[in-house]
């Protein structure tokens, strides 16, 4: 099984702007510096994405703050799984190119965005992340407000450093943190939705890099409680040269259990059941969709075709020691995204 684990603290990029050590790690040992990148500022992409799901309350929210060079994308999603309802509002900004001052590390700093429609802030204090959001006209003239706290104790995460064969100065540096207990509330449409830290979790997708123009990727993530244990997973592929390592992993009580390849089996209709299978037999799942958060943007040189599907997963995952973890209707999401930008 491939999967080279990076274990040494070092600069992410060498003096030539090339990724020094492709592979994966349990925490961000490779140090990202925007100044080390040998590409135009319009090509640099930096983003923080949070998903917070409540299996007990049948709702969820997602938040994105990003600086993607010649375009910024700030986004909020509300999900009602009981009624299969979702709404997403996105604000696009032209040529941010570093103006958001995205932190160079995932373990510290704050990000703030404010305009006449949206105020959103991500804060990180000691072992706790805070999400604050006020979207004035989110849906049919109704605002959305949220204040959510995520516990972030020391635990394994999924960090990947991936190059592209066709461009030595392109790279994808990403950390996924799962299983962060959530508390707080969302106010929307006259209702208050409250997260219960006993059952509800958030996850972070922290990414920095320079991509090639045309990419399709697959990604899935889930966090929850199984038989009294914190359990989560991150699966995905399609992005860059993954010969050094996959980004497939299980999390069990804060410890990562690395997987090899996982394949998404998707029908043409994204709301039909999906299947997931693995080369090492350690992730075999059926997935029943609830909501397809579909989004299509096609504006000349910028094209994005997204299907982020939320649903419930059932099947078996196997830890490093052979322990089987059986999932039954485990709330999570999986996506297929094609981007040109």
Predicted feature residues:
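Structured soluble/peripheral alpha/beta segments that form catalytic or ligand/cofactor-binding pockets
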Residues: 1-341
